[in-house]
Regions:
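Short hairpin/turn module used for nucleic-acid contact or packing/dimerization
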Residues: 297-351
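Divalent-cation-assisted or electrostatically stabilized phosphate/pyrophosphate-binding catalytic cores
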Residues: 100-136, 186-203, 249-276, 286-313
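Hydrophobic packing residues in well-ordered alpha-helices of helical domains and bundles
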Residues: 5, 9-12, 73-79, 136, ...
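Residue-level signal for inorganic ion chemistry
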Residues: 55, 143, 269, 322, ...
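Active-site alpha-helical segments that house and flank conserved acidic catalytic motifs
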Residues: 73-101, 165-172, 203, 211-214, ...
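Conserved N-terminal diphosphate/IPP-binding helix and adjacent helical/loop segment
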Residues: 1-80, 85, 89-125, 175-191, ...
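Well-ordered alpha-helical scaffold segments within catalytic/enzyme domains
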Residues: 58-64, 143-150, 208-216, 271-276, ...
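All-alpha helical catalytic cores of prenyl diphosphate-utilizing isoprenoid enzymes
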Residues: 29, 45-51, 130-141, 148-246
Length: 351
């Protein structure tokens, strides 16, 4: 995708570290539980690809911003990484996951902690859920605080709060829709699943950080940028769905076909349902949780249904839309180059 330079990564990481150190210091007087929560929060924000801060910085420079003259850039970029971490913590809670990237997440850490002091299964689950809710809440506030205290003009701050407000609200709407789709007795249609995929990820991961960078650089018109970024964000999420079904262990960061084993209701599955091959796909999905052989069978049936090609075409449609919006006369040449490069990078991720 897109990466921060070593120097820029160091500036973003320093801003994140300052925010987490502040949280740790504030939790310290409040006892062992608060200290454990601060440690879990810090661990959840460690490492990562820093995609969203990279988009903030790339957009800022593409719209003519001077990184040396804008110290607020690093706090705002860090805010989007902390927002991302908050949403991941809450997403793991909703999905009942206790690990992320093979490492115990906030809930997982507090499950172990509760077991250690003798909690029963119900108490352990309650403590783990509470810790994940509270950790995500603290991170959401910290992301907002970074923008509130950054060295910005009043107008910049107002615009950035509007961007952040939309990102958090739309992500919450998408997360709820995703949870309700998973709970329904019937499989939602492809449009509903596409809308949830867009809302859950595209706004906070692409549109918001790209707009934030443009605001910091003094851009006055964001319509074409917003439209291109929304299309890029949806394409990115759809490629993630393809990776979750067909990607390698290296691409997915977990066992191949994990989405099939976990019976996730993705746009890919909704497209398969619209085909005559659905009975065979459905039968294969019903046993995909049993092991690698069953996963491979489900992969073959989905591919034979044409759903994989159909989803790839949706990815390409959104990338074409993004490139069309990027060609708008209102965008500076470097912003056009940036959006085109992002579209190319997303295309290369297709498994």
């Amino acid at each position: 995708m897109i990466e921060l330079s070593d120097a820029h990564r160091a500036r973003v990481d320093a801003a994140i570290d300052r925010a987490l150190a502040r949280l740790t210091a504030r939790c310290a007087p409040h006892g062992d539980g608060a200290q454990a929560l601060a440690a879990a929060v810090s661990a959840s924000a460690a490492d990562g690809k820093r995609l969203r801060p990279a988009l903030v910085v790339a957009s800022f420079t593409a719209f003519g911003g001077d990184t040396a003259a804008t110290p607020a850039l690093w706090d705002v970029a860090a805010a989007f990484e902390i927002l991302h971490t908050a949403l991941l913590v809450h997403d793991d809670l909703i999905d009942r996951d206790v690990e992320r990237r093979g490492i115990l997440n906030v809930a997982g850490r507090f499950r172990e902690r509760a077991h250690a002091y003798g909690a029963d299964d119900r108490g352990t689950a309650t403590v783990a859920d509470a810790a994940a809710v509270l950790a995500g809440d603290l991170l959401l506030f910290e992301a907002t605080r970074l923008v509130a205290t950054a060295a910005l003009t009043d107008d910049e701050r107002d615009q950035l709060f509007a961007v952040l407000d939309e990102a958090i609200l739309v992500s919450a709407v998408g997360e709820l829709a995703d949870a309700e789709h998973a709970a329904r007795a019937d499989l939602p249609d492809a449009h509903a699943l596409l809308t949830a995929a867009h809302d859950k990820t595209a706004v906070y991961s692409f549109r918001a950080p790209l707009r934030a960078g443009a605001v910091l650089a003094g851009a006055t018109s964001h319509a074409a940028l917003s439209d291109a970024a929304a299309a890029l964000g949806l394409a990115f999420q759809l490629v993630d769905d393809l990776i979750g079904t067909f990607g390698s262990r290296r691409q997915a960061g977990r066992d191949p076909g994990a989405d099939l084993r976990e019976a996730k209701r993705t746009p890919l599955i909704a497209l398969a349902r619209q085909t005559d091959a659905w009975p065979r796909v459905s039968d294969a999905l019903a046993v995909a949780h049993t092991g690698p052989i069953a996963v491979r069978r489900a992969q073959r049936e989905i591919e034979a249904s044409g759903a994989r090609v159909g989803l790839e075409e949706l990815v390409h449609d959104n990338l074409r839309r993004a490139r069309a919006h990027a060609s708008s006369a209102e965008l500076p040449p470097q912003a056009v180059v940036l959006l085109a490069a992002l579209a190319d990078a997303i295309e290369r991720r297709i498994p």
